[in-house]
C-alpha cells in the first residue's frame, strides 16, 4: 500500500504513460481508497446499474463511498460457511449430514446450545472467540462512527456476550487466528468442532495436504451456519486520471 499511496499522490502530475490506470484492493482496506478522489465512480466509466444486476450486494457495498457512490467492482467474492469436523458431529450430534448439522447451528442461540453439548463430550465448539467475530461483524446494521460518537452495534455486543459465556464455560479459547494453538483443531487430537471461513481456508490454510490432518481425508463438512458472511475477495478500482478509461471499463466488465 505504501508504494500505491505514494504513486497516487503524484498521479495528477505524472506523464500519461506513468499514470496508474487501475489497482486492486481487499475488503479490509477498500474504504481507505474508495472514500477519496483517487478512485473513479464506476458510472463515469460508462458502466450502468444494469451491467451489475447479478452482483451480490455486499460486493458493491464494500466499495461504495460515504456518499453512496460505487467506486469499484469485484470478480472474486469469498462467501464463507461453517466447516465442521465430521467425526465430532457424528460423535456428539449423531449425524454428519450437512442439513442435519445445520439444525444445530442455525442461529447463535442454537449454536451456543450446541457448544454446551460439544463441551460435555470434550470438544471445543470453536478454536477461539476470534473465529466468530467476522461473522457477527459482517452482519451489523449500523456504522462504527455516528457523527462524533463511537457506536457499538447490537450484533457486536452479542458477539462479546456470547464469547464471554463460551470462554467462561470452557467451550472455546481466546488464542489469535493463525497461531499454533488456533490451528490445533486442524487435527483430530485438537478436538475442535468447527471453523468459519471461505473455500480458500479449508483448501489452503487448514493443513489439508498434511497426512493425519482432518482435511487430508476429507474430514470437514460444510453448513451455512448462524449467519452469512464473507472473508476476503479482490476489487478493481479505476484510478482518477487514467488515460485508459475504456480499457479499464472493458477489464471490469470482462472480469
Language-model features, listed with the residues they occupy:
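Periplasmic-binding protein-like
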Residues: 86-88, 252-255
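Structural recognition of the beta-strand scaffold that forms the well-ordered cores
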Residues: 21-25, 72-75, 81-83, 125-128, ...
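Solvent-exposed loop/turn segments at secondary-structure junctions
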Residues: 2, 27-32, 78-81, 88-89, ...
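Extracytoplasmic "Venus flytrap"/periplasmic binding protein-like
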Residues: 1-55, 69, 91-92, 184-186, ...
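Extracellular/periplasmic catalytic domains that process cell-envelope and extracellular macromolecules
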Residues: 14-18, 33-35, 63-67, 74-76, ...
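Short helix-initiation/N-cap motifs at beta->coil->alpha
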Residues: 1-10, 105-110, 174-188
Amino acid at each position: 500500500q505504501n508504494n500505491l499511496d505514494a504513486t497516487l499522490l503524484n498521479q495528477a502530475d505524472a506523464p500519461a504513460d506513468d499514470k496508474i490506470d487501475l489497482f486492486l484492493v481487499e475488503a479490509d482496506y477498500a474504504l481507505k481508497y474508495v472514500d477519496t478522489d483517487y478512485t473513479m465512480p464506476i458510472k463515469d466509466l460508462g458502466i450502468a446499474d444494469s451491467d451489475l444486476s447479478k452482483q451480490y450486494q455486499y460486493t458493491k457495498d464494500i466499495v461504495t463511498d460515504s456518499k453512496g457512490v460505487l467506486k469499484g467492482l469485484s470478480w472474486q467474492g469469498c462467501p464463507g460457511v461453517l466447516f465442521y469436523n465430521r467425526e465430532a458431529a457424528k460423535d456428539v450430534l449423531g449425524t454428519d449430514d450437512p442439513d442435519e448439522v445445520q439444525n444445530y447451528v442455525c442461529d447463535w442461540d442454537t449454536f451456543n446450545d450446541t457448544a454446551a453439548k460439544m463441551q460435555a463430550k470434550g470438544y471445543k465448539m470453536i478454536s477461539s472467540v476470534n473465529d466468530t467475530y467476522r461473522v457477527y461483524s459482517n452482519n451489523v446494521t449500523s456504522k462504527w462512527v455516528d457523527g462524533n460518537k463511537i457506536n457499538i452495534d447490537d450484533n457486536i455486543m452479542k458477539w462479546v456476550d456470547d464469547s464471554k459465556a463460551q470462554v467462561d464455560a470452557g467451550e472455546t479459547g481466546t488464542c489469535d487466528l493463525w497461531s499454533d494453538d488456533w490451528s490445533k483443531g486442524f487435527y483430530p487430537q485438537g478436538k475442535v468442532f468447527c471453523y468459519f471461513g471461505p473455500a480458500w481456508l479449508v483448501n489452503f490454510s487448514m493443513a489439508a495436504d498434511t497426512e493425519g490432518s482432518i482435511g487430508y481425508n476429507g474430514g470437514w463438512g460444510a453448513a451455512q451456519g448462524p449467519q452469512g458472511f464473507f472473508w476476503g475477495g479482490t476489487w478493481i478500482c479505476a484510478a482518477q486520471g487514467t488515460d485508459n478509461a475504456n480499457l479499464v471499463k472493458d477489464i471490469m466488465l470482462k472480469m
